[in-house]
Every structure is written in structure tokens, then in C-alpha cells.
């Protein structure tokens, strides 16, 4: 299945600034509008990566968003402001079709057959780190980064997923990623606790909660 990536839905591109030690390796940073993904992007900028922020539109932002939901119109604005603070480009990409076919439809099908599906796992596997990687390829990005609390370890047989902060561990949400996906994944918050993330947000001038 082919997907069309719609660049920038109504938001200006912010030019990135780097220091003399910037390594210049391009990274697509998934930005939900929350503090975790914003800090993850900020830490990568500090390390010298060429960071491109991306927020994924999973459904029409005119529809009412429930508490704790992602990708509402306010999330787009929060992500845009965080990207502007960090001095990086920001795009909103239309993944509504991919989300519906790979997450919603699968959830309904599994539920009808008596299974207990986890839509977050499917979303990360097929959309955030599946389809998003295609966008990374398109713009010449080597890695995709997220704000998950999980770690990656280098073993003799390749990359392995490991638990992050026990209180906030989110490695389960990435458990179905294939080795080739893990090899191109960056998890800047893997060794941090939530309080440390918030401290980094304050230091970076990020105002998201």
C-alpha cells in the first residue's frame, strides 16, 4: 500500500540552528505535542543531530478529542511551538488512512474474534515507526526518534529493546518492532525518569506540560 505524505498543514517551517559541533545526521523526531517527545527532540538537537519534527494527524482535528488522546488540533499547536523553541523544522503529516486501516480496522477485527488488542502497539509498529520511516527515507533521514521511556541495547545479534524507567516503562508499546526498525530508532529518554524529563523541558525553555 502506498501512502501520500501531505507536508505541513497550515504551519510555517522553522529553520534549524546548529552549533559548530553538529554532526549533521538527520533524524525525524515524532512530536505528539507533549513534554516527552519535545524533550527527546531537544536532547537530539543538543547532541548535534539535524532534527526534523513531525506530528502525525491520525484523524480529522475538527472531531472532538477525548482526554489523553493524541493528535488533536491543540497537540499540533503545542508541537509547533516546541519545534519553534528548539529551532527545528516542523511538519504535520496526514496519516489518517494508514491509522484507520492498520490500527482501527485491526482493533475492531481482533475484538470481534474475542482477542484483546492493544492499539498503541499496532500504532507504533505500522504507523509511527512503519509509515513514518518511509517519510524519513524520503527526506534523507537516517533515524526516527520518539519520546518513549524504553532503551535500546547493542548485542552480538543486533539491537534489542530493554526496559526504561520502571515507573514509566513503555517498552511494551515497541515490542513488535522488527530488528531493522530498531536499528533506525533513537530513544533519548531511555535512561531518564519523568522528573528529569520535566527538568530538561524547563532548561530547554519548553512550555508543554
Give names to the regions the model predicted.
Residues 3-5, 11:
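Aromatic (phenylalanine/tyrosine) cluster motif
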Residues 11-176, 186, 194-203:
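ATP-dependent adenylation/nucleotidyltransferase module used to activate substrates
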Residues 180-184:
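A short, charged helix-loop
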Residues 205-209:
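Mid-to-C-terminal catalytic subdomains of enzymes
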Amino acid at each position: 500500500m502506498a501512502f501520500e505524505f501531505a507536508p505541513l498543514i497550515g504551519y510555517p517551517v522553522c529553520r534549524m540552528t546548529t552549533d559548530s559541533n553538529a554532526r549533521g545526521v538527520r533524524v525525524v523526531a515524532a512530536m505528539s505535542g507533549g513534554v516527552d517527545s519535545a524533550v527527546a527532540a531537544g536532547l537530539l538537537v543538543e547532541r548535534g543531530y539535524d532534527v526534523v519534527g513531525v506530528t502525525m494527524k491520525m484523524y480529522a482535528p475538527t472531531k472532538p478529542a477525548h482526554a489523553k488522546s493524541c493528535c488533536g488540533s491543540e497537540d499540533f499547536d503545542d508541537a509547533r511551538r516546541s519545534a519553534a523553541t528548539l529551532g527545528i523544522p516542523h511538519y504535520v503529516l496526514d496519516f489518517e488512512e494508514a491509522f484507520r486501516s492498520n490500527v482501527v480496522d485491526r482493533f475492531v477485527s481482533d475484538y470481534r474474534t474475542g482477542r484483546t488488542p492493544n492499539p498503541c502497539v499496532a500504532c507504533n509498529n505500522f504507523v509511527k515507526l512503519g509509515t513514518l520511516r518511509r517519510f524519513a527515507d524520503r527526506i534523507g533521514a537516517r533515524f526516527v526518534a520518539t519520546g518513549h521511556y524504553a532503551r535500546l541495547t547493542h548485542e552480538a545479534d543486533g539491537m534489542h529493546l530493554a526496559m526504561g524507567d520502571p515507573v514509566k516503562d513503555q517498552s511494551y508499546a515497541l515490542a513488535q518492532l522488527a530488528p531493522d526498525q530498531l536499528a533506525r530508532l533513537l530513544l533519548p529518554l531511555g535512561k531518564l525518569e519523568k522528573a528529569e524529563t520535566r527538568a530538561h523541558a524547563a532548561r530547554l525553555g519548553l512550555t508543554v506540560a
